[in-house]
Design a protein with these regions (language model features):
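Surface-exposed, charge/polar-rich loops and edge strands
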Residues: 1-413
Length: 413
């Protein structure tokens, strides 16, 4: 029984949504974020990454950075850049990339559902990243970046979504990366009640992207509960900003690996080790170098591409984590042969999102790496199976596109 609520959104005036909407805060390093804000002063990164308002000599975690985020947010509310909705609503957030459409419900999810396992996680979080967002949410008194949630497709929700999308969108713009964004407001009481009831029948919701934002929102909620011992559960700090998508509309892209050296092996030596563990064939001519099916990955080394097939005896369907292609590559090759024991901390491995294409793997091998591995994308069903088992995905297993924009919905707590 998921508790997914409408909320009073703070959001851009209709004509300002395109210039305000920004990629998630953690997509950029400090230099990139600063350049983006210089190009687009109204970008929501001015709030999400308020260190962009200070010289590099100022620590990005200084108290005054969070205070600037608070001040900028509420100045934009006061000067009319943002409006405050006059009632609790749900919103539809539709993203179209390369002809693929996915439509989510923007709403607030319950921190109790997060803590009792109705909202399921599949990633560990890092304390230092949590602390940053905890302070940002707490000082701003608002959640500014939605958590990307997924649920098993539900016909009742789909009907309301399709009906709503027949009306006029509140926002309709195309971002610089070619993604079209449309937002619809669900204001009718009957539709609001129907969505609330439909989600109440959903027994599991999954964090697709935004584990640190979710953990931070929950911890701020817990802190506020301690500060308000008479809390009722109705206060806004008991809920966190989310956009919920049906699983059958989501696209996970490949998340590829590049290794800086061959750990002492020659080209032929490493090839022999790979051949012992996988069924290998060279890719010749103009063949596509992307893996074509689960159980296959492609390797690039010294201007040669190879297709590598996982053997059936290495499959472990009873263990949803060990059975992932990325786990088998890690456990059969990256650790025992290339010496990558902990991919989270080993500086010899890097990860390349599939949105960058196979050419980026070749470029990295020409520039600063020795071998690249192109993976077949993890499926949403595999992610659900891992989360349902209460397990964690290996690092850098999933790359979701398109990314949700921050700044289109703000939840005051």
């Amino acid at each position: 029984m998921a508790e997914i609520r409408p909320f009073v959104s703070i959001r851009p005036q209709r004509g300002k949504a395109a210039e305000i909407a920004a990629l998630p805060y953690d997509v950029y390093n400090r230099e990139e974020a600063t350049k983006e804000v210089e190009r687009h002063p109204q970008s929501f990164l001015s709030i999400d990454r308020a260190e962009t308002q200070f010289p590099l000599s100022v620590d990005m975690y200084d108290d005054k950075v969070y205070e600037r985020a608070h001040d900028t947010l509420w100045q934009w509310v006061e000067n009319g850049t943002f409006l405050t909705e006059d009632k609790k609503c749900y919103y539809l957030y539709e993203l179209t990339m390369n002809g693929r459409v996915q439509t989510g419900v923007a709403a607030c999810a319950s921190i109790d559902d997060y803590e009792n396992g109705i909202i399921k996680k599949h990633e560990n979080t890092r304390a230092e990243k949590e602390v940053d967002r905890i302070r940002h949410v707490d000082v701003c008194n608002a959640q500014t970046g939605p958590i990307f949630l997924a649920y098993r497709a539900n016909e009742g929700i789909r009907r309301i979504v399709e009906k709503t999308k027949q009306g006029e969108p509140e926002y309709d713009f195309t971002s610089e990366d070619g993604v079209r964004h449309r937002v619809f407001v669900i204001r009718e009481d009957a539709d609001i009640a129907a969505i609330h009831e439909a989600f109440a029948g959903v027994d599991s919701i999954y964090i697709a992207d935004g584990h640190h934002r979710a953990a931070s929102a929950v911890k701020v909620g817990q802190k506020r509960r301690k500060e308000h011992p008479g809390y009722t559960g109705e206060e806004e700090f008991n809920y966190f900003l989310s956009v919920l998508f049906p699983d059958d509309e989501l696209m996970i892209m490949d998340y590829n690996r590049v290794i800086r050296d061959l750990n002492g092996y020659s080209f032929k030596g490493l090839y022999r080790e790979v051949e012992k563990r996988f069924d290998v064939e060279e890719i010749t001519g103009a063949e596509d170098t992307r893996p074509k099916e689960r159980g296959t990955f492609c390797m690039y080394m010294e201007e040669h591409w190879f297709s590598c097939h996982i053997r059936q005896e290495d499959r472990t369907p009873e263990d949803p984590v060990a059975d992932l292609d990325v786990s088998i590559l890690q456990n059969k090759l990256l650790e025992p042969v290339l010496g990558i024991r902990d991919p989270k901390t080993d500086g010899r491995i890097d990860f390349v999102g599939g949105i960058r294409g196979m050419d980026e793997l070749v470029r990295r091998c020409e520039q600063d790496c020795a071998v690249a591995f192109a993976m077949y994308p993890t499926s949403i069903a595999e992610l659900f199976a891992v989360a349902d088992a209460g397990l964690l995905m290996p690092p850098k297993s999933t790359w979701f596109e398109p990314k949700l924009r921050s700044g289109l919905f703000i939840h005051e707590i």
